[in-house]
Amino acid sequence: MNITIISVGKLKEKYLKLGIDEYIKRLTRYAKLNIIEIPDEKAPENLSSAEEQIVKNKEGEGILKNIKDGMYVIALDLKGKMLSSEELADKLQSLGVAGNSNIAFIIGGSLGLSEDVLKRADYKLCFSPMTFPHQLMKLILLEQIYRGLRIIKGEPYHK
């Protein structure tokens, strides 16, 4: 399985980088992993909705350029479907069985994802109705992918 994580924003916090590096190392036993960071656009606090749309569209263009033909795209979106760890494992396994071995997970910037990215997504996944910093979301996503792949292999994991 080939997994690509496309996220907006460069990771700056050292503690998150350490956690992400740990899960990248763990995941190499189960999948080929590629992480792509798209530069985030400057977004001051008081943007109009039109200005927010411009920022999301620019970030979206960078995301879409990195989605290859044939990739199954899972966008992280607050309006997406919430899954348990076991259900995520089932989703990953069913994608592999169906021949979708190239999976891209998309993490938007602080304003979310553009409509074009959401339209390109084959599936929308929500981790929680709460909002998380997108850098932290990358760590949470990697942990859940790792957990899901261990579940698929029938290996023990912490419940």
From Swiss-Prot:
Coiled coil: none annotated. Keywords: Cytoplasm, Methyltransferase, rRNA processing, S-adenosyl-L-methionine, Transferase. It catalyses: pseudouridine(1915) in 23S rRNA + S-adenosyl-L-methionine = N(3)-methylpseudouridine(1915) in 23S rRNA + S-adenosyl-L-homocysteine + H(+). Its EC number is 2.1.1.177. It is found in: Cytoplasm. GO terms for cellular component: cytoplasm. GO terms for molecular function: rRNA (pseudouridine-N3-)-methyltransferase activity. Its main location: cytoplasm. It is an enzyme of class 2 (transferase). InterPro entries: Alpha/beta_knot_MTases, RlmH-like, tRNA_m1G_MTases_N. Pfam families: SPOUT_MTase. Specifically methylates the pseudouridine at position 1915 (m3Psi1915) in 23S rRNA. Belongs to the RNA methyltransferase RlmH family. Homodimer. NCBIfam families: PRK00103.1-3 (NF000985), tRNA_RlmH_YbeA (TIGR00246). This is Ribosomal RNA large subunit methyltransferase H. It comes from Alkaliphilus oremlandii (strain OhILAs). The gene is rlmH.
